Amino acid sequence: MAIIGLGTDIVEISRIEAVVERSGEKLARRILSPAEWQHYQQHQQPIRFLAKRFAVKEAAAKAFGTGIRNGLAFNQFEVVNDALGKPTLRLHQRAAELAAELGVKSLHVTLADERRYACATVIIES
């Protein structure tokens, strides 16, 4: 296997909070998959949840080398956790097509947050 992409993003959680205060749930609906939306609505700290998901999706877009454009959208990257809570990505629509075109075999996600920041790194292997 070879690393074919690496992306990192850091988000100031208060920035996400300000956007949600200003525009309601518009940001969350644009970023989250339907399953993530359900978790967001029930989460004890929804702003922190949203900030972490945003960081992962930005990192994924960077790792793929595309950014969010040309048919690629935030909600096509879905953060899911295994039985131990380890995050990974489930890809949908154009994101899944792009992964197939690139020969992606594995996606690795690491996620961290502190009081003010959420940070994520995504590694793509072929």
Swiss-Prot record:
Where does it reside?
Cytoplasm
Record has rRNA processing as a keyword: no
Cofactor(s) required, per the database record: Mg(2+)
Pfam families registered for this protein in UniProt:
ACPS (PF01648)
Q: Does the keyword Lipid biosynthesis apply?
A: yes
Q: What is its EC number?
A: 2.7.8.7
EC class of the enzyme, as a word = transferase
- Main localisation, per the record? cytoplasm
Question: Which reactions does this protein catalyse?
Answer: apo-[ACP] + CoA = holo-[ACP] + adenosine 3',5'-bisphosphate + H(+)
Q: Which GO terms describe its molecular function?
A: holo-[acyl-carrier-protein] synthase activity; magnesium ion binding
Note the InterPro entries from the entry.
Answer: 4-PPantetheinyl_Trfase_dom, 4-PPantetheinyl_Trfase_dom_sf, ACPS, Ppantetheine-prot_Trfase_dom
The positions annotated for binding Mg(2+) are 9, 58
Q: List the keywords (alphabetical).
A: Cytoplasm, Fatty acid biosynthesis, Fatty acid metabolism, Lipid biosynthesis, Lipid metabolism, Magnesium, Metal-binding, Transferase
Alphabetical GO biological process terms: fatty acid biosynthetic process
One Gene Ontology cellular component annotation?
A: cytoplasm
Family classification: Belongs to the P-Pant transferase superfamily. AcpS family.
Known role: Transfers the 4'-phosphopantetheine moiety from coenzyme A to a Ser of acyl-carrier-protein.
What's the name of the protein?
Holo-[acyl-carrier-protein] synthase
Q: Which organism is it from?
A: Yersinia enterocolitica serotype O:8 / biotype 1B (strain NCTC 13174 / 8081)
Lineage of the species this protein comes from: Bacteria, Pseudomonadati, Pseudomonadota, Gammaproteobacteria, Enterobacterales
